[in-house]
Amino acid sequence: MSADSLFLCPQCRQPLPVRPPCSCGFLLRESNGVINLITDEESAAVQPFLEAYEQVRQDEGWGGDDLDLPFHPRRHLEIWSIRQRTFRKFESIVADLSRGTALDIGAGNGWMTRHLDRWGFDAIAVDINTSPMDGLRAGQKFIDEGASFLRVRSGMERLPFLSERIRLLATNASFHYASDFRIALSEFERVLTPGGIIAIVDSPFYENAADGERMMAERVVEFRRKYGMPETFARRSRYLTYKDLEEMVRSLNLSCQVLPVWPGFRRSYEAIRAKFAGRNIAEFPVVVIEKHFAMGSNRDTSHGS
């Protein structure tokens, strides 16, 4: 994988040359194995949120030594029991997909990126979080153990990749952090090859926006009480409705499947109790979105890269 065949300058949005700097002056830098493809302005803008996010993650016990995921977690066992099922569903979906470049958007420590590499993809972990606790730098453990993947610092709304180069784009418990869902999905469509797929995994969906708004309002109160967190930061993690998803997909001329995943006995019981109380809890389906081939083009069904 070479920079001239894949990367886009985050500053001028032109193909990034092999020999830096870019003609606009942007200089590609790598630190602790992470390729920085975010502008200084973007980095400064997101830093306050990252500091607040890290505080919550540490308090809730995420990251650190909990890396052998999703099947051997040390903490949050109930959450990971659900994610094991969504992971298996995701694995079955990509089994017959032509291999090529795969992005793990919002990759965190790269535990899913490691699996993409094992399955034969040219895998890239993408995240704005480079923390050694649960961000991109934490992925060094997998690389030391033999995994092969790149780590790129970037936001999901301005991906630093050339158009139509990505075979698979997975958002792993991360799409709900997008500041604008439609802009992010439009970027995903731009970089995807015809016939490639987008998989939205472990993001909360609701039938009705009122239930999602209730969840967010409760989080705002909790995070203000526990961390003194501003409302804008507490609302960075959002939700989707099935109607909004359908409208976004249609507007971008994509096709979509929503595949339900059984959440387990406990959460099923919680869903029943919530309905009796006149509300609904979040669902976590696997959403598969496909980019169509252009009229008259030849479908490539090979399994080569």
Each predicted region: which residue ranges?
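Core SAM-dependent methyltransferase catalytic element
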Residues: 254, 268-300
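A conserved beta-strand element that flanks and buttresses the S-adenosyl-L-methionine
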Residues: 170
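Short alpha-helix
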Residues: 234-253
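A short glycine-rich, Lys/Arg-flanked "PGG" loop and its adjoining helix->strand segment in the class I
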Residues: 182-197
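Short catalytic micro-motifs in class I SAM-dependent methyltransferases
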Residues: 173-177
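Conserved class I S-adenosyl-L-methionine
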Residues: 31-97, 115, 199-223
